[in-house]
Amino acid sequence: MSGLTLVGSGWHPAIFRSEAEALVGPVGFVHPRVVVTTSTDEIALNRLSRSALVDEVLCKAEHSEVVEPENIIQRIVDWGKENLPEGSFAVRVNVIGSSLAGFSRSEIAQNVGAGVFGEAHPVDLENPDNEIVVFLAGPEDPPNHPDPLYLSPPKIIWGLKLKSWQRSGWGGRSPMERPYFQPVSLEPRLARLMISLGHRSDSEPTTVIDPFCGTGGIAIEAMLAELNVLARDLDPKMVKGTEENLQWVSEDLCSGYSATWDVQESGVGLTPDVWGKISGAIFAFDPPYGRNAWKSDDGYQLFLKACSAARTIDHSGSLCTLLPTDPAILKDNSDEPIDYLVMGKPWSKVADEMLDRGWEVVLIAPVKVHKSLARLLVVAHPSH
């Protein structure tokens, strides 16, 4: 296997690319929603199965600038004759971004299928042995989230669907489907994203720690990623609710997994005393904040305590958090940095105070909540 091509979600292409790099190391850029990696081992595939924003994984893939449809079809046919394993096949054609003028999904599928078809390669649209997947990757629509690469030129990508890669869907565990629900619950995709962004190429994670577990959204996704869970909350109702949700997950959704979990009722400053030293920790949390969200520093000191406690528990772990910020950040496509308020403080001050506690920020990305609130997704690694 020479390499893999990863196709990502259109929800936040910039974070998709960051997530891919966190999971498999350096990636090559093809399109805002398509990257390539040379990592193909079992560890890489296992990490990719934990992703939030990777939608498809292709092997033996190629890509091209947009040329005449007939030329593209012939290139895919020639490639298919050389790379398609023996057995039945189907051709799937997808559009990401804006549609490409002059290209028809059905015509590409039919003509590629007809060109590759043969005794060793019968067509089976229902249950094929192999799938040729084509992506017509048009220009990205103006994004909801800032992306410096969204004006990149369109591409056409094709390859074999990697049968050994699977990622669980999001059905069956939305906040309202869990035994214990509160309106503050984090959606599964965002919770999973925080975990995957906590991966690093120089170490393998073992445990996800959430010092503000709420209803257990992050803890649930950690268990489904087959990572151990340590969670705490000061509110006994939340602790009981998280335990109820994790028991449900362990019995109904991941009964065959070996991941363990523990939920404690304690203040964030006591976290090191509760669990001691941990190796391979991802600290993933959504800290509580006041009613005025990004304009208020309510909860700021609690956040800093969590940063200090995390460094004490695992001095070589990683940290990923969501902090309330000014929604104007979502419209910022300028090259000049603006010191937006985050939890009532200028972002530069927040980053400096994290550094004082041993955490160097390596990634920030705004995430839209609604028109009056955004959150800043922050990833930090040990500063020394």
Walk through the language-model features, giving the residues of each.
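Short secondary-structure capping/turn segments at boundaries of alpha-helices and beta-strands
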Residues: 24-26, 78-79, 120
